[in-house]
Amino acid sequence: MSETETRPTNFIRQIIDEDLKSGKHSSVHTRFPPEPNGYLHIGHAKSICLNFGIAQDYQGQCNLRFDDTNPEKEDIEYVESIKNDVNWLGFQWSGDIQYSSNYFDKLYGYAVELIEKGLAYVDELTPEQMREYRGSLKEPGKNSPYRDRSVEENLALFEQMRDGKFKEGTICLRAKIDMASSFIVLRDPVIYRVRFATHHQTGDKWCIYPMYDFTHCISDALEGITHSICTLEFQDNRRLYDWVLENITIDCQPRQYEFSRLNLEYTVMSKRKLNQLVTEKLVNGWDDPRMPTVSGLRRRGFTSASIREFCKRIGVTKQENMIEFSSLESCIRDDLNESAPRAMAVLEPVKLVIENYEEGKVETLNIANHPNKPEMGTREVPFTREVYIEQDDFREEANKKYKRLVLGKEVRLRGAYVIQANRIEKDEAGNITTIFCSYDEDTLGKNPADGRKVKGVIHWVSADKALPAEIRLYDRLFTVPNPGAADDFAATINPESLVVKNGFVEPSLATAEAEVGYQFERTGYFCADNKDSSADALVFNRTVGLRDTWAG
């Protein structure tokens, strides 16, 4: 962090400041604990920036821990993807990567301790019976008929569970807390269940697995986490978090703090809905540039700096709110406006022939890579007798507000000459196929000698030297701000969320690196696709337009 940059403030940082000042903690230790059962999205990025950012700013530590207690839904592919996303966002975890599965032996021991204290019991209610016994927000729960088993019987049964003597769904270990609690999470929650599943870290060593609420708090304590930060849906779970730690023999007593999760307009972040988009092929995979996944945003051309800035701007509160999608777009637009070199691309070409320009001549023009940053240098752009311009940049007739090329009028080609449109050719359907022009040879890099004013400037590429490219125009995936609230969210998908154009780009883009942003002049910000683009077949993704077309 630079000296001029101010450290963000929020209620969590205020708590940390007080804890350090009072001597409650001498240092700060946070963690980011994803379950490896899917790809990270921008909501996770908010949590990553918060937890790793706090560790950075307070010269503390932040662990990356995989909460891997559900082997049927987890995969090493997700582990690797999450590691890559955290690194790409600009963060590095402290020490080795942690896994909750590293603590399975200790977790088993703590479960035995609860049984020995009379605070856990083996239950044989069916899942349906357990739901019935649990009660509701208005009705207290009922005690299981197995609740008062002896410590000895519970220990023996739990050992048999571990040894694989029971079928899945027939038996579990529950904490003995209070079936009449006003908090349903405290109504004797399940803390271990039988699962005959191969685990990606521990193989077939275990056939019983601890539940998240039991595992999470103990993992935090074993790692010396000082501030366990999670989203608001875990607010009630804090009571169970504290209960577990207060009733086992463990040194560290972390505290859990909750903040509001990210809700972003025009997208969904529910894992179930995102999975539906992929499995029903409504998008092209988890890294589709329309997806809110970190890999999708990265492929679209969002920079890690822009996502960090977005997370900084939206802040950290306990208040649930919906963030405008334009806020995210503003961050990447601000970033690329400063950093992206300029280039020219024509998405809907029409040929323009300069009749008084020498046939076969190729002129090399040096054009600035950035209008305000001479240190970014120049690039060579070939100029020839025939060029392509955008169809929208020409009209046969137009009013004075139209500042582009009009029949009989002049315009400047960006970085090149002033030209005048003299005549056109059309096909049988009436579409313009060719615009015939003349150029003023004495206007390269300067105004016409006779002082006439030429106000319009349009971009172009050489028809002979330009490279064909597939241009993917990405837009918001949904047509409504809150698609998750719709009865059928898939019905609100924006049919214009991907429009493909076959255009031409200037030759300098032949070596464009994937994910590196360019401003296609007068069009938007683009990057080469990180999967489909190659030297033989260029593919560019639109990251964001030059301005917010959804405003107002």
UniProtKB/Swiss-Prot annotation:
GO CC, alphabetical: cytosol
Gene Ontology molecular function: ATP binding; glutamine-tRNA ligase activity
Residue interval(s) of motif 'HIGH' region: 34-44
Motif 'KMSKS' region per record, residues: 268-272
Protein name as catalogued: Glutamine--tRNA ligase
GO biological process: one example: glutaminyl-tRNA aminoacylation
Compartments, record wording: Cytoplasm
Predominant location category: cytoplasm
CDD domains associated with the record: GlnRS_core
Keywords noted in UniProt: Aminoacyl-tRNA synthetase, ATP-binding, Cytoplasm, Ligase, Nucleotide-binding, Protein biosynthesis
Gene3D superfamilies with a match to the protein in the record: Glutamyl-trna Synthetase, Domain 2, Glutamyl-tRNA Synthetase, Domain 3, HUPs, Ribosomal Protein L25, Chain P
Reaction equation(s) it catalyzes: tRNA(Gln) + L-glutamine + ATP = L-glutaminyl-tRNA(Gln) + AMP + diphosphate
EC number: 6.1.1.18
Description of how the protein assembles with itself and partners: Monomer.
SUPFAM superfamilies: Nucleotidylyl transferase, Ribosomal protein L25-like
Lineage start: Bacteria, Pseudomonadati, Pseudomonadota, Gammaproteobacteria, Vibrionales
Binding site for ATP: 35-37, 41-47, 231, 261-262, 269-271
Record's keyword annotation contains Protein biosynthesis: yes
Coiled coil segments of this chain: none
